[in-house]
Curated annotation (Swiss-Prot):
Protein name: Intraflagellar transport protein 140 homolog
Effect of L777R: No effect on localization to the basal body
Lineage: Eukaryota, Metazoa, Chordata, Craniata, Vertebrata
Pfam families: Beta-prop_IFT140_1st, Beta-prop_IFT140_2nd, TPR_IF140-IFT172, TPR_IF140_C
Residues annotated as signal peptide: none
Phosphoserine carried by residues: S360, S1443
Organism for this UniProt entry: Homo sapiens
Length: 1462
């Protein structure tokens, strides 16, 4: 809660009357313009408490016309009535006069948004733009000049678009971008001079003239008329969000214009505002689009531009306003959300904007503003203005100027005395023990208060005043000067602070004792007294406690540093001590002085500190060790997540119970409550309840920190004041102080500014004696720690039913139903005990507790519990039982739609019982029970019922009314309503009753109504008209009756059709009828077949040789049919050469061998479907496992013969024969499946078969195939085959790529594999190894020869010539490569004769080879030219490629292996 202190400015004696006031936007400096009786004008600057700033007086012999502060610097522009413009630099105490260009009153004076330019305009219409330096001096000539010829009234700047980057514009301008150049240089215009200024300065503005026109000046300095109003413009605003211009004229016409960047305005809205005209209105645009007007009336008028809504705010007389008090001026502080208005009676009215999370859901209009306590000044307030970053309020009342600053309202509670500040110099003192309240007015602005049972102390930082109760009045007991920021009292002592000490004084100020603190400990700045103990906190986060029980204060604990006990904290925000002095609670602040979510508890005796974090609900117990280290023990206190994420702001100890502690916590980030569709909070709590909590705890050395109670702070209370069993005490909001009839539930009102609420355990026991109070405290403590035995011991001697009822109520809070049963028993509350026993079936604990709360009359708790556990069905019933029907309907409509109709129905019954038939009728309709409930309800009022029936046009109601008329014998009228209801059965029934059978038949035929047709058929049967009876029985689908008539009357043709339309039982009866007659046996067979009686149908078909019917029957047979029937039918199809159908029937009969033999015998292809049907499940009892495998292999063999390799593979696999499956898969040639099958089979033979197959493919171009070949040979342990593959790879590298290095590597791998292989013939293995080693040596020699060529060409050539002499060289190395190497060498040496010799030798050894394949054509040409020989012709190459031959050999090997495998 806050108060506004008013400070009158210290104006010079000769200053005169204040005419203008202007706050600096940032700094707390207020400029005030005066006009004296001699028309002399002056300006002075003042500080926030009204002190005049020295050397800031500016005076001229003419009056001030306008004032304007620089946006950031301490530079003030002053416009005078002569046209002079003075710029005063407060920092340098300099005055700079602008060049005298204006010759009339300065009516417009504005700084540009950046502060680099000053815009001035006068009464003659001259508009100038000046550039100024940082000290306020003019730089050159005016940058812009326009002469409009008429009185300038307003000017507003338009901020540039946010997307324009100055750096990017500069780069673009340097690059020659014309648009960028234009933005950096304003060109010459017809009406203005050159302006060298960029649009980033914000130099886009609007100016208005006295004739009602508005002109727009763009970034080029061009002026354009954009608005022409019908009267003088009173106020001009620019809405940045919508890029729109708001114009309000003298006759209160509002116009809204959208203004695009090019400046062409378009009017989008025009309205006439309500209000008194003929005088100047003060208008403000707040919240972006809300217009507030003070027009000299007793109310503020609002117009929401976005929504098009309007409303008014009027001051309330109960706040001290007078009737007929008018509002002159208005101003809004966005930071504080405060709207201030000045009245003609010297009062400042304030409305605070209600935050969304505190306001009522969906609050709009005036409900969003809460009237605050006004500030009373003197005179007629003509101007009011918020300013500076401190959000100070300046008020001009013509005779004086006052500065209002906000300060927190002081309050204190101690020893059953509460003192509450209600105005800057007025206290409300309540003696709670007697209920007597006093008003105490002081001659100072109070900054602090301390109350005891004997006296009240107030101070303002410079003076201390002590007041004591004397009889029925409060009188002064002492006053003394003392600059103490804090103060405390105990008995006859006053404790004040100064640098590094606490002074113990008498009431008259005499110092009796000094409590000293060292410089390292800091200056005392916090004091608190509880019981006989004083605790002191310093600005360096040290604290110390003193025992005051003796004549002099003695140290109770040594001075401790909070930073050492709890590393990471910043400072101390506040501290308190328990009544026994054993525990000190401290609210720390963070390093940046922001509120911390932690609270610290220091145990004086154990020298330990416990830190509780409200944000996480975690308790951290730290034990201080002798060597300055700490041990920590962490645990969690809060189970309810809703209690986390709070920050403590107030904390108190009970003044007599040292274990009881209470604190007030606010939500860390206030948020809007989730709301249901009907606008109500989902958890049922009000806004303040969700964001401010009161939490009480039991704190003991043995059991630690225990949560006792938590509840939302009462909505009528402002803050927690303290606690003393059995009450919590709160300060009341000023607007709630006089509302005696609106006390918060559970709170008891004390006159004036204090309210109290009993502790949860003391509801109903507020006036109990001390013994009962102590017993209750013990009980509450033991219940909190869960020791129920000790809890009951503490109250076993208490016989009061009120105590047990209170215990039961406490069980609702603690949700201890076991204890509640005992309490209900002691209370003799049988109904409650029964309800609690019946509620045990509910799964949610909260729902069961809610039943207990309901029985105890704690309806609000029950409601909250139902909401908490989201049992909206029970909440709905609760509301219904409580008669809160509107809430029940809301819950049903938004959360319990399952019971919506039943809720509507019960509410309608309630309304009916209340004789509200019209509304009851409406809710019966909503519940969809009106068709029988409304006729019942209106049965005594037949005319109304008939009107209702005709109005509703409902078939059910028409039928009900027709039945009523029929019961009254009004047949014609009944027929009319039956016809409206389209009740064809009733129509036919009445027509038959009246003997009009033809009409009844016509209705039945036209409508096809089954009941009508049946009724008419019965009528015809009774009249022995069999044909008509059968016809209408058929239309009624009563086929049994129709069949009966046909059988009785020999209507065999109709019988067949009716039987086919009827049920299987009727078909069988009809078939027996035909069978017994012995004629038309085909019909009997068909009916048996259609009825599903296949055995009888087959028997009859065979007996009567009906083969066509037999085929139709066989088509419907499946595996569920009788195997004997299936076999008999299959034989029939075999006899008639229908083998496929026979196979299907054999398979359905599970005769798999016969079916397979039939396929083989008739050379039938086995399809996949047939193969699947022949496959017996593994766990089937039809065949043994061995027979099942044999059958599968036979199926697979058959598939192999018919070429279905994939199917064969599948069946071999199912039979467990993977080798045969692999052979089948190899025949299919499906490489992907072969690779996959080999990978998953994990059999050596299969790996080898797969690798052999893959070698037959083009593995040279597919690296993946080569990888699989190597992998399969390796997994199959076929190292000899793998060696052969590596050998083939080496040959490919030589033949196709001439890559002898890779060839050597492949031969090496081949050698390794062959060396590891287990050969059948060691001799053959040794021979192969020797061959491989020989080939490897040759290849290595050739590689070495080519590598050494660059270092030693002679040795390299020599090695090549030796290679040519090796026998069988061609089987390893291509001879042509060696010859080519030699030829190339000799060509480079220009030894053409030797080169030619090697060419000729190569031709002899390779007669069919193409020389260009080994020797480049250039080298051959060079040889022939060098020797003068003719050039040779190229011969096509015919070279054997070993790799291709190897591939053919591998292919043959795979085929041989596949054929040889068993």
């Amino acid at each position: 809660m806050a108060l506004y202190y008013d400070h009158q400015i210290e104006a010079p004696d000769a200053a005169g009357s204040p005419s203008f006031i202007s706050w600096h936007p940032v700094h707390p400096f207020l400029a005030v313009a005066y006009i004296s009786t001699t028309s002399t004008g002056s300006v002075d600057i003042y500080l926030e408490q009204g002190e005049c700033v020295p050397d800031t007086h500016v005076e001229r012999p003419f009056r001030v016309a306008s004032l304007c502060w620089h946006p950031t610097r301490l530079v003030l522009a002053v416009g005078w009535e002569t046209g002079e413009v003075t710029v005063f630099n407060k920092q340098d105490k300099e005055q700079h006069t602008m060049p005298l260009t204006h010759t009339a009153d300065i009516t417009v004076l504005r700084w540009s948004p950046s502060g680099n330019c000053l815009l001035s305009g006068d009464r003659l219409g001259v508009l100038l733009l000046w550039r100024l330096d940082q000290r306020g001096r003019v730089q050159g000539t005016p940058l812009l000049k326009h002469e409009y010829g008429k009185h300038l009234t307003h000017c507003i700047f338009r901020l540039p678009p946010p997307g324009e980057d100055l750096v990017q514009l500069a780069k673009a301008a340097v690059s020659g971008d014309e648009k960028a150049l234009d933005m950096f240089n304003w060109k010459k215009s017809s009406s203005g001079s050159l302006l060298k200024m960029g649009s980033h300065e914000g130099l886009l503005f609007f100016v208005s003239l006295m004739d009602g026109t508005v002109h727009y000046v763009d970034e080029k300095g061009k002026t354009t008329q954009v608005v022409s109003a019908d009267s003088t413009i009173q106020m001009l605003f620019y809405m940045e969000k919508r890029e729109a211009l708001v114009v309000v004229t003298e006759n209160l016409r509002l116009s809204l214009y959208t203004v695009p960047p090019e400046g062409k305005a378009e009017e989008v809205m025009k309205v006439k505002l309500s209000g008194k005209t003929g005088r100047r209105a003060d208008i403000a645009l707040i919240e972006g689009s809300l217009l507030v007007m003070a027009v000299g009336e007793a109310a503020l008028r609002f117009w929401d531009i976005e929504r098009g809504e309007n409303y008014i705010l009027s001051p309330d007389e109960k706040f001290g306003f007078e009737k007929g008090e008018n509002m002159n001026c208005v101003c809004y502080c966005k930071v504080k959300g405060l709207l201030a208005a000045g009245t003609d009676r010297g009062r400042v009215a304030m409305w605070r904007k209600v935050p969304d999370f505190l306001g009522s859901p969906g609050a709009e209009g005036k409900d969003r503003w809460a009237l605050q306590t006004p500030t009373e000044l003197q005179g007629n307030i003509t101007q009011i203005q918020w300013g500076s970053r401190k959000n100070l309020l300046a008020v001009n009342s013509v005779i004086s100027v006052a500065i209002l600053s906000e300060r927190a309202m002081s309050s204190h509670f101690h020893q059953q005395v509460a003192a509450m500040q209600v105005s800057p110099s007025l206290l409300n003192v309540c003696f709670l023990s007697t209920g007597v309240a006093h008003s105490l007015r002081t001659d100072m602005h109070i900054s602090g208060v301390f109350a005891t049972k004997d006296a009240v102390a107030v101070w303002n930082g410079r003076q201390v005043a002590i007041f004591e109760l004397s009889g029925a009045a409060i009188r002064s007991a002492g006053t003394f000067l003392c600059e103490t920021p804090v103060l405390a009292m105990h008995e006859e002592n006053v404790y004040t602070v100064e640098s590094n000490r606490v002074q113990v004084r008498t009431w008259q100020g005499t110092v009796k004792q000094l409590l000293l603190f060292s410089e390292t400990e800091g200056n005392p700045c916090f004091l608190d007294i509880c019981g006989n103990f004083l605790v002191v906190g310093t600005d360096l986060a040290h604290f110390k406690s003193f025992d005051l029980s003796r004549r002099e204060a003695k140290a109770h604990c040594s001075c401790r540093s909070l930073a050492e006990l709890v590393p990471g904290v910043g400072g101390i925000a506040s501290l308190r001590c328990s009544s026994s002095g054993s525990t000190i609670s401290i609210l720390p602040s963070k390093a940046d002085n922001s509120p911390d979510s932690k609270i610290c508890f220091y145990d004086v005796e154990m020298d330990t500190v416990t830190v509780f974090d409200f944000k996480t609900g975690q308790i951290d117990r730290r034990e201080t060790l002798s060597f300055n280290e700490q041990e920590t023990n962490k645990s969690h206190l809060f189970v309810d997540e809703g209690l986390k994420n709070y920050v403590p702001v107030n904390h108190f100890w009970d003044q007599s119970e040292p274990r009881l502690f209470v604190c007030e916590a606010v939500q860390e980030t206030p948020r809007s409550q989730p709301q249901s569709a009907n606008g109500q909070p989902q958890d049922g709590r009000a806004g303040p309840a969700a964001d401010v909590l009161i939490l009480s705890f039991f704190i003991s050395e043995e059991h630690g920190f225990l949560l006792h109670e938590s509840f939302p702070r009462p909505a009528t209370s402002h803050s927690l004041l303290g606690m003393e069993v059995p009450y919590y005490y709160f300060t009341r909001k000023p607007e709630e102080a006089d509302r005696e009839d609106e006390v918060e539930p559970g709170c008891h009102h004390i006159p004036q500014m204090v309210s109290r609420r009993p502790l949860r355990d003391f509801v109903g026991l507020e006036d109990c004696d001390k013994a009962t109070r102590d017993a209750m405290l013990h009980f509450s403590f033991f219940v909190t720690i869960g020791d129920m035995d000790e809890a009951f011991k503490s109250i076993k001697l208490i016989k009061s039913e009120a105590v047990w009822e209170n215990m039961a109520r406490m069980c609702v809070k603690t949700q201890r139903l076991d204890v509640a049963k005992v309490c209900l028993g002691n209370m003799g509350h049988a109904r409650g005990a029964r309800a609690l026993r019946e509620a045990e079936q509910e799964p949610e604990l909260e729902a069961r507790v809610a039943v207990l709360a309901t029985q105890l009359g704690m309806l609000e708790d029950a409601e909250q519990l139902y909401r908490k556990c989201k049992r909206h069905d029970l909440l709905n019933k609760f509301y219904q039982a409580a008669g809160r029907w509107q809430e029940a309907l809301q819950v049903a409509e938004h959360h319990d739609r399952v019971h919506l109709r039943s809720t509507y129905h019960r509410y309608a019954g309630h309304l009916e019982a209340s004789a509200d038939c019209s509304r009851a009728l409406s809710y019966y309709e909503k519940s969809d029970t009106h068709r029988f409930e409304v006729p019942r309800m209106l049965s005594e009022d037949l005319p109304s019922l008939e009107l209702y029936v005709n109005k509703m046009k409902d078939k059910t109601l028409w039928r009900w009314w027709a039945q009523y008329l029929e019961s009254q014998g009004e047949m014609d009228a009944a027929l009319h309503y039956y016809e409206l209801a389209r009740d064809h059965f009733s129509l036919v029934r009445i027509h038959c009753f009246q003997g009009n059978v033809q009409k009844a038949a016509q209705i039945a035929n036209e409508t096809g109504n089954l009941a009508a047709s049946y009724h008419l058929a019965r009528q015809y049967e009774s009249q022995e008209e069999v044909g008509q009876a059968v016809h209408f029985y058929t239309r009624a689908q009563a086929f049994k009756n129709a069949i009966r008539l046909c059988k009785e009357n020999g209507l065999d043709d109709q019988l067949m059709n009716l039987a086919l339309l009827s049920s299987p039982e009727d078909m069988i009866e009809a078939a027996r009828y035909y069978e017994e007659k012995g004629v038309q046996m085909d019909r009997a067979v068909m009916l048996y077949h259609k009825a599903g009686h296949f055995s009888k149908a087959l028997e009859l078909a065979f007996a009567t040789q009906q083969f066509v019917a037999l085929q139709l029957i066989a088509e419907d047979l499946d595996e569920t049919s009788d195997p004997a029937l299936l076999a008999r039918c299959s034989d029939f199809f075999i006899e008639h050469s229908q083998y496929e159908r026979a196979v299907e029937l054999l398979l359905a009969a599970r005769k798999y061998q016969e079916a397979l033999q039939l396929c083989l015998g008739q050379n039938m292809s086995i399809t996949e479907e047939m193969a699947e049907k022949m496959t017996v499940a593994k766990d089937s009892s039809d065949l043994p496992e061995e027979s099942r495998r044999e059958l599968l292999e036979q199926i697979a063999d058959c598939c192999m013969r018919q070429g279905s390799y994939h199917l064969a593979t599948k069946k071999y696999t199912q039979a467990g024969n993977k080798l045969k499956a692999m052979r089948a898969l190899l025949k299919s040639g499906d490489t992907e499946k072969i690779t996959f099958f080999a990978s998953v089979s994990r059999q050596k033979e299969i790996y080898i078969m797969a690798a052999n197959y893959l070698q037959s493919l083009d593995w040279r171009k597919e690296p993946e195939i080569m990888k699989n070949i190597i992998g399969f040979y390796t997994k199959g342990r076929a190292l000899d085959l793998l060696a052969g593959f590596y050998d083939a790879c080496a040959q490919v590298e030589i033949d196709e790529y001439q890559n002898y290095d890779k060839a050597h590597g492949a031969l090496t791998e081949a050698y390794k594999c062959l060396a590891k292989a287990k050969a059948k013939s060691p001799l053959d293995q040794e021979t192969r190894l020797a061959q491989l080693q020989s080939r490897m040596a040759l290849v290595k020699r050739f590689i070495q020869a080519r590598r050494t060529y660059t270092e030693d060409p002679k040795e390299s050539i020599k090695q090549c010539e030796l290679l040519l002499e090796e026998p069988d060289l061609d089987s390893t190395i291509r001879i042509g490569d060696v010859y080519g190497f030699l030829v190339e060498h000799y060509v480079r040496k220009e030894e053409y004769q030797t080169a030619y010799r090697f060419l000729e030798e190569m031709r002899r050894r390779l007669p069919l080879a193409n020389m260009s394949y080994y020797v480049s054509p250039q080298a051959v040409d060079a040889v022939h030219r060098g020797l003068g020989l003719p050039l040779p012709r190229t011969v096509p190459e015919q070279v054997r490629h070993n790799s291709m031959e190897d591939a053919r050999e591998l292919d043959e090997e795979v085929v041989e292996e596949a054929d040889d495998d068993p």
